[in-house]
Structure formats: C-alpha cells, structure tokens
C-alpha cells in the first residue's frame, strides 16, 4: 500500500482521511482525531496532503510539512 495523496476533511471533533495510490485508487479510508492525523502522517512516507483551508488547517499543515509532506490547502 503506497499512498501518494492523502485527502483530509477537517472536522470539529474528527477528521476523515482518504489515501490514494499512484493510480488514483482508494487504498485507505479512515476517521481519526486531529492528533490522529499527525500520528498517521508520521507513519507515512512523504506524500501530498490535501485539505480544506479553514481555521486550524494552517497549524496542521505546518506540522505535516515538518514531517516532510507536501501540504496543499484548497
């Protein structure tokens, strides 16, 4: 399972994450807390992490960027 893009839907209490491989196929679908997103990012090799631009997204983006990921806010 090689995840190249991780889509993150930020919520107040939980976040939904979807991981896509290089062909665009869904290989991971999970609901986690915001801290869980950071822990998941630490386990994954460097990839693109896409999330909506909302309050808290910039902080989470900085944390994920420090882990070596490419963060894209939409």
Predicted regions and their residues:
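Phosphate- and other anionic-substrate recognition elements at nucleic-acid/protein interfaces
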Residues: 1-74
